[in-house]
Amino acid sequence: MKPNFSKGLLPAVVIEEDTKEVLMLAYMNEEAYEKTIETKRTWFYSRSRRSLWNKGETSGNVQHVQSLYLDCDQDSIVVVVKQVGPACHTGEKTCFHYKII
């Protein structure tokens, strides 16, 4: 089974394998998805820069892909990783560090 990229970018929720903590949300196009499978590292599509980016390529905070899950509609992805360093560009462990309720 493969993701359905016919409507464009798909959301990719990245979680830590050991803790199941949500680390970040990013978007994948088909090329990012294929590179993620090929390299076992996360690749995403930047909507602002309109280009691919490899998580941790600059910072060293890489994500080693352990598994990928596809939802029932084939239009969103869960990426299970072993995170090296913080996932957020702010230096926080997760991008979801602002508690609302």
From Swiss-Prot:
Oligomeric state and interaction partners are given as: Homodimer.
Supply the name of the protein.
Answer: Phosphoribosyl-AMP cyclohydrolase
The EC number on file is: 3.5.4.19
PANTHER family (alphabetical) = HISTIDINE BIOSYNTHESIS BIFUNCTIONAL PROTEIN, HISTIDINE BIOSYNTHESIS BIFUNCTIONAL PROTEIN HIS7
One Pfam family name is PRA-CH
Transcription is among the record's keywords: no
Instruction: Report the main location listed first in the record.
Output: cytoplasm
Which stretch is the leader sequence? none
Q: Which Gene3D superfamilies match?
A: Phosphoribosyl-AMP cyclohydrolase
